[in-house]
Curated annotation (Swiss-Prot):
Residues 71-74 are annotated as: G3. Residues 133-136 are annotated as: G4. CDD domains: Era, KH-II_Era. GO terms for biological process: ribosomal small subunit assembly. It is found in: Cytoplasm; Cell membrane. Coiled coil: none annotated. GTP binds at residues 24-31, 71-75, 133-136. The keyword Cell division does not apply. Belongs to the TRAFAC class TrmE-Era-EngA-EngB-Septin-like GTPase superfamily. Era GTPase family. It comes from the Bacteria. This is GTPase Era. Its main location: cytoplasm. Pfam families: KH_2, MMR_HSR1.
Length: 309
């Protein structure tokens, strides 16, 4: 993974670079924090838990420092093969990183899922940052932070604490980012300085579409939807033509995603297209199709085909 060509020439200032996992239970603000670190959108966000399904790498670089943030799925008790894959993504990230950000929600005391995260990170000999999020909406943030801190009792590794508001003020995010930069080991850069993510454009666009679907679909249906881009072409006039699929498990789900007269699918497509146009800074044609792959969340072959491997 290391590219020696990204190292400074002999005699130049040495570079520091490392991988930093962002972990926590579902829906505590991990992806929102990652996007704030980078000042751009590389990870999907929605009010629903488990929006993030795979480890998304976001890259922040200065002239001599590089953080590769790994935004992980929320650690939880899995109900299917997809859930097991998501937990494996977390465990794999923790094994390979140089530092850990554990994000907790200060509006609530620790839950069983928080305890599960604490057990994963407590004994790891890596710098750990306990991030108390949503402090502005918490009634008793100091007491909540004390309870989360207690879950790390007995930890001997380097530990830092910081509270953040739900709005992630630029000053607070920058201060935390500087603290993380100080913890990086001396290494050559892992990615070119201009990189913001290791995702392909197709993966990124598919996640934008899935985010908009999750915002609009109800009950358990959002968790039974996957997305993939099947074709992306650019016309001579600059228009980006993107074809994508929304994958569901049942014909009944297909009807719900399409909606009466196609209303739901149009809403998802219009919202996703607007996001894509803002970030791509060009006109986009987005064509969506809903297909059925029965039981895809329990089908390991289907999961691999959808990129969960």
């Amino acid at each position: 993974m290391t590219d020696q060509s990204l190292s400074p020439e002999s005699g130049e200032t040495p570079t520091h670079a490392g991988f930093v996992a962002i972990v926590g239970k579902p829906n505590v603000g991990k992806s929102t924090l990652l996007n704030a670190f980078l000042n751009t959108k590389v990870a999907p966000t929605s009010p629903r838990p488990q929006t993030t399904r795979r480890g998304v790498r976001g890259i922040y670089s200065t002239d001599t420092q590089q953080i590769v943030f790994v935004d992980t799925p929320g650690l939880h008790k899995p109900k299917d093969a997809l859930g097991k894959y998501m937990n494996q993504e977390v465990q794999s990230a923790l094994a390979d990183v140089d530092a850990i950000l554990w994000v907790v929600d200060l509006r609530h005391p620790p839950t069983e899922e928080d305890e599960l995260v604490a057990r994963q990170v407590r004994d790891l000999p890596k710098p750990l940052f306990l991030i108390g999020n949503k402090v502005d909406a918490a009634k008793y943030p100091d007491e909540a932070m004390r309870l989360y801190r207690a879950l790390l009792e007995g930890r001997t590794g380097e530990t830092h604490e910081r509270m953040l508001s739900a709005q992630n003020s630029p000053q607070a995010v920058a201060a935390l980012r500087e603290q993380i930069l100080d913890a990086l080991p001396e290494n050559p850069f892992f990615f070119p300085r201009s990189s913001a993510s290791d995702q392909t454009r197709e993966q990124w666009a598919a996640e934008i579409i899935r985010e908009e679907a999750m915002k609009r679909l109800r009950e358990e249906l959002p968790y039974a939807v996957a997305t993939r881009v099947t074709n992306w072409t650019e016309r001579e006039d600059g228009l980006q033509r993107i074809e994508a699929e929304l994958i569901v498990e049942k014909n009944a789900h297909k009807g719900m995603v399409i909606g009466a007269g196609g209303k739901m699918l149009r809403e998802i497509g219009q919202a996703a297209r607007k996001q894509l146009e803002v970030f791509l800074n060009c006109k986009v044609f987005l064509g969506l199709e809903v297909i059925v792959i029965p039981g895809w969340r329990e089908d390991e072959e289907a999961l691999r085909e959808l990129g969960y491997e």
